[in-house]
């Protein structure tokens, strides 16, 4: 069917018609026209298709007959039938088949004629292993993209592998990905170097270095030499290809460096903004070096070509020779040919002619022509960029001179720079003229004029391609005139280039659209091209004037105008299009105005910025997407680079007439090859396009380095500039160093600015490498800011110039928008966070609940209030976040950290809320609890924020503090695992997150093992404890922070401390680090301890925070149990008393806080402690039970001055030292007591708490107690608080007075407190109660209180008295442990009666309180044990010990809250009453025992023996020994004992307290941190856990459990009696329900929890974990108090990363463990026969076993009996058949039968040798088992194969001889029969059976074979000399196979 076949009449119509329609018909199938058409219709072209039915050529005499649409014919009566159904006549089955048409797409060859930036598809590999071959390398690279070519370089001399390879990818992305993923990776044992090497210059340099013997493949300098980073290298590499392209195209004129600056200014270079300017790498070739061509490239980048091409960089290396060629051939032609690229080409043509001339002249004319050529290049080119004429006119001379200079540039002659200065002036003038023809600078000296003339000529050439605008401008005055003017001005203003540049900028600003981009490039190039420009001289200015401003924003007329001196040029040169550049330009301009000297440096920074913006510009050629952005940046960058390079004028460049004699002085790096013509900065305007804008020659000025004085300035500036621009570009250190050093080199000899060097590069005039700015700067000569707008840079009238000015605007707008968006995001996020979390609502709710709980003592209420607090905390967090965000701390886009979520980005405000509004007395108490753990700085910030939000926030913060604590406690389990990790992740943000999360968990109720009620109690009490303990800490903090309301502050601080701890960590380096360590490494207390020792108070606070946190972690678990008790105790406490106490405490705390704020952190802590002491004293008076009163008296006896408080802090840190009973003085002596808490309040807290000041400790403890009193006191809690107080009061004493009462109460009161049964039960229950069972609230409260009190001083001290059968009452325990903030010892103690009175005792509670005791008094061994449990084994021990103690305490909340004695008085020698003495004795006993047992471990661990912990631990043994002599223990001694006995005591305590031992996780134990109020004891345990190896802890736990059980059993009666007494006393209190003993598990340390949590990174996460995580996530989302970060968290399904495949049991079967963990890495090793026997015996035993079961499993057949019957039947059948046929037939029958019914067999490891074949079903005798299958081969082949197999290392022989001629080879192919091993006593035999004339080997059973019995036969090898050992192990084994 031919369209032309249509009739003549139709042809006119049809050809088109047919063509289209028929084509459509062919393509889509013919659509029949429903109606036949006439020929007229055909003529009407209505037909869609036609067919030539009759062709006259085929049928003579006939006319053509067409059929249209299958129906109409061209002739009326054609006689041909129409088509019935019009359809596509083609055979569907043929034409529907799609044939892949693979048309080869021609690939552009990258050679010297390649125009435009070379795509960075070529990757150079270095340092490859010499075993890597092309195939391997290709396979390695294929994964990143299609590989077009792979070449490995070999030494031509010896063909040795040079370790260098070239890989050309099909795509830029593939090359980049390969470099990204393969660079600095280990391949075949070598760390390989991969970089983008666009033109292979780096590779060739490597090649030369290696072939010449300078380096070996492994010593080859790759990273630092070339480019510090592959990225930098990539940029140069990209630039290099471009350079080559440019240089080849442009000719030699585009030297890698010298022309590079301009070429970068040109579109090429600008596109290559990522590429370092020519100065960056002295030569473009030196891409690898820090100074990548990028540095020189900047100018070229300014031009559209340059930036893209990065040619300039290449040019540098290429030198004049390369340039001339390219210049002549490509650049000139391309430039002239491409009007659009006039800019680049203009410079190119300039360069081309120049290069041509230079090639010829350069050498001849070094002075003037070089100068002129540089000018022509820089100025001329710039003009060319602006007006082709100038570019062309100047260009020839410039190029000629420059080109030779380019070679010189390669030589790095500095003489050139001065010349280039002259030219620079000229070029500037030209550029300026183009920019503002109106202001051509007056002609300078004749030489200048000559230069100008030459420039004019060259530019004229370029003029044709040049931009008309530039041309017109240039035409306004003759090029010569303009050049002369420019030169004149430049000379006159050589040193005023900065100001001139400003004017230039102004001029360019007129042409800003072009000027911006070209100017950006050009300004620097002008500097480069002429030292004048660099020097901020008038001449430079005229040049700028000549140049049009291409930059988005008009370039500053003067350097001052430029935001950053030199930046304007860079920006403009870089690219007007780049908004960033534009933005930078204005800044640079301003800076330039401000600092002309800075111009050079600034320009360099601009270049850096450009590079930063587009780090890949050089690398990509920026053909990739990067290029587009980079090009603008590149332009500026190039400009900057050029500027830096400029200082090094190519020797060929004639120095600008004015000055820079020093040019020769500059030690130029190897001469920069003339920059590629496209380097004209003006070309930058269209940075993306490689071609420079037409008529825009490279800026000549760029080629001239500024005078030395300018360079020095540039040098310094370059540092800055590089910092900025390259910073964005990721300048490598080496890159910067080299750039600066080279610049410095140039500076020394040249007066040119760095930008001069760059412009020289652009002008291709720089014979020298651009010297690093530092070189010039090093000169110390301030360079006047080089004209930011190099004359070379200003493109002719490019529209892009206009864009450039807009770019600045756009950038500004973008910045504004970004700021607004940030603000909006901040606002919205904060609002959302606040709304979602509803902190305020939650806080209010919590406060309400808390008040209700206090009033009603209802755990639920306390829990509710706790929830409220949680909400408040959340709100507080939110407010803090908002505050910190508002402060602009880090909520930029980067600040927001959207990637990691808000909590990562938002510095979740420290929860150390400094809100000063105490909602109420209770809140005041809470505020007191605020941990002073925040660093002062953080506190200040927080306080400021808090103050801002003070009204709301303070309430919230209070609530938040409580809420946080509450949340934490419920989330304890999470906290233990996750909170720390959260904290570690982002202490600030994550803390709040944690709190929110915990709160949510609590709300969800999923996290807390305890009932919500218990949790609520525990939470509330814990929170209260936490609040109190942290409150104390926070009071200290608040004092520092000026927390007006101690209560609110404390509440907030408490909650915020946990979150703020993290924030503090972030805010304060030391504190942050320490806190982070504490949070993250609570178990690594010693770490923080070291830090803390340096900062006692800060660390103390941190310890508090940490302790609180950890305690919170544990508290949530523990306090869930203990909180109810606490709540009950608290509730028991009269609200009035509590409120009074709280108010007092709050007031004092506020005062203390004010003092603290005034004072240093340490002092404030002390003051707060004093106040706290007073408060505690008040509390003692208010709530002190006789016991507690005594204790308080003791405390009171010990004054608690500020110093004491300070000392108390120290003590808190010092509790580590363990001292015997007589050690009270030691306590008073400064002792470094490290809390054993996981956080290691003491250990971690830098400050060393000194036990010297018992008063201080007492005060602190007292204060804590008051705080606790302020909050509704659960019995255990109060007891804990009092115990803490007492402990604090007398850390060293056996028992503080309160401790004595506690002990007594423990012995008696505790019994009274807890019903005897309860006590007994509690002891047992506590022990029995696991962490799970044990009401978390009680222990928690203890923990919380302990945290609040002093972390170590936990209200929740385990209330188990050492001697008492019943757990020590919280009071006794509390008294026992001095309240040392951050020390495990400080636990508020309350008289058992007070704490426990009226409050039903839950075993967990008492248990929880028990942990408090361990702090100061070993008197309460059981309590310390609980404490220890909390510390060492927070969950188990704490619960155990606390259960007994805290049960007692909880069950009998003491009516009088015991103010914990000042923590500072842990060592007061307080003689306890008889009970107290007993407790003391017990403590002493425990202490001694623990000291002996644990002192080493404790001190070794670096954990201070926690008095509370230790004391609690001892209580059990003391309980037993209470009956024995009782000796007072010094608080410190007790602490030491406790600390030492953390493990041992914990054991003893647990023994003493069956409940604790039972595995009930003491809330105190749960929190590892002393900071946790309930963790006082726990804190001790935590340190122990942390300090003591897990095994030891476990052992200790076991021992403790045993001891506790023994002690419990021994003292059960006494305890029961005491419990009965207590029960009688507190019979009114509801008795805690008996909790069935739970399995006791050693509580995991936070570290362990975190390890488990983060194990997903190692072992992955499975579906189950993901399911529960998702459930938890959903629940959290459903909670009103959800964490803020949940808003930013989306649940995205992710496949499980831990897919557990059934474990292979081979190794378990006896195979060895691979030493290296990888079998492959160990090679082959033989399995010892003994090892084999292990599993072989198993197999044999299995085989020997009756096969019934196995048979049933393995054989689908019937049971064995039926199977046997079947076998028998088959045998009978065979026998019958055998009677009819011969043996052969029988065998054949067997064979066929085998095929019909195959035996079930399997192969597995054999005890005989390697693999064996085993029966999976019973096989009767004489049955065919399997055929030996393989390849039938002849003997000859078998011999050959045997040898080959041996060579291949195949040790086994699988050849089976069938007969004399045939052998079956099963080595490579076969079946399982090949695995049958030889045996001297086989159970099978082989038989050759002939089947269809083929011989087959069949294995028959020789006897009955059981299931799993190995099938063997006798190989019957012939006897040979070389024996093969037989391993069959049979009795009659022959020993050998042959």
Swiss-Prot record:
Q: Where is the Post-SET domain?
A: 1922-1938
Biased composition annotated in UniProt, kind: Low complexity: 512-531
Top-level taxon in the UniProt lineage: Eukaryota
**Where do Pro residues bias regions lie?**
1454-1464
Q: Where is the composition biased (Basic and acidic residues)?
A: 1-20, 588-599, 1159-1174, 1329-1343
Instruction: Cite the RRM domain residue spans from the record.
Output: 111-199
What are the Acidic residues biased-composition ranges?
Answer: 619-628, 976-990, 1054-1114
Which terms in the GO cellular component ontology are assigned? chromosome; cytoplasm; nuclear speck; nucleus; Set1C/COMPASS complex
Q: Where in the cell is it found?
A: Nucleus speckle; Chromosome
Composition bias type Polar residues, residue spans? 254-290, 298-312, 375-407, 446-457, 532-546, 569-585, 1349-1358, 1441-1453, 1751-1765
Annotated SET domain residues: 1799-1916
Renumbered to this chain, motif RxxxRR motif spans: 1770-1775
Q: Which family does the similarity line name?
A: Belongs to the class V-like SAM-binding methyltransferase superfamily.
Function, as annotated, reads: Histone methyltransferase that specifically methylates 'Lys-4' of histone H3, when part of the SET1 histone methyltransferase (HMT) complex, but not if the neighboring 'Lys-9' residue is already methylated. H3 'Lys-4' methylation represents a specific tag for epigenetic transcriptional activation.
Q: What is this protein called?
A: Histone-lysine N-methyltransferase SETD1B
The source organism is Xenopus laevis
